[in-house]
Amino acid sequence: MSQFSSSRAKIPEHYASRGIRHWSNTKIRCPLAYLIAEYSYRQPRYYAAKKASENGDAEADLQVAHYAKPKSINMLAGTAVHEAAFEIANGKTSQSEAVRHALSTLQEHRPAKYNKRDITITDHLLSDDGKRVATTIEQTVEGIREAFAGANQIDVEEKIELELPGIDVPIIGYTDGRGAGVIGEVKTRWDRISANSKTGFANNSVPARAELNDIAQIALYQKAFGGGTCKIIYANRISHIVHEVSQEQLDEAMNQTLVQLRKRQRILERTETMRDIIDLCEVDWSDF
């Protein structure tokens, strides 16, 4: 039996004491300082306060608010477009209904008052009666249909749990889509703030080649499934592009991931406190 297959499997102390029960693509790629600040500090305190609040502790409400981390409009928009596009591609809903639902979700977003950037982007994204969102959904659907040509059904949000040699906890993730022998990952691009534009925004173009972090992410899924053709779909409000990733690129990405995980695990093993880890970091505050 797998060392990770039982819910009772013991998490090593050097992981458990830092609030890390598994790796994810985000945890692997993010800067070390962010990993500790987010997963070892903020999240455990937020969920502890939330549980206390649900159990009737009124004072915990302040802690919930303090440690909460509101999602950005770009994050919410990406999720909404993913869901809408796969629903359309699988024939489960119409384009108009999917767009309507995505917009209704995004219109509920209330940016944090301190997050001026998110306020500006939210106003821009929703200022044209949803046309930017609608056209991004259209481009994403076209990209999905191109990537999964011949698939009768695309399975979405499949959970993967991957074990790697020498790594004490598994990698857990969720695919965007899989069908007809293809593993597909969707990446949406949203207008970016630009001081050189009359509108204050510029189109965020789709990349001419697949980006390294995206290759590393989809390589995890291929490894977990034991094979498959990997394609990354990039879409914005104007265009889309589908990049098929070579096996050489995937293998190299997996090798680099294993190197990164071994480094991070050694840091966890050889430090006693979070302060010890933080002392190893050169913090770039733009990561936060």
Please annotate each region the language model reported.
Residues 83, 87, 91, 190-192, ...:
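Short loop/turn segments at secondary-structure transitions that flank enzyme active sites
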Residues 37, 89, 192-195, 224:
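Active-site-proximal flexible loops/turns
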Residues 208-215, 220-288:
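Metal-dependent nuclease catalytic regions and adjoining charged, substrate-binding loops involved
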Residues 1-174:
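Metal-dependent nuclease catalytic cores that hydrolyze phosphodiester bonds in DNA/RNA
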Residues 58-64, 188-190, 233-240:
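Short acidic (Asp/Glu) and glycine-rich catalytic loops that position anionic groups and cofactors
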Residues 155, 178-186, 229-234:
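A structural signal for short, well-ordered beta-strand segments and their strand-loop junctions
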Residues 75, 160-217:
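Non-catalytic protein-protein interaction segments used by genome-maintenance enzymes to assemble
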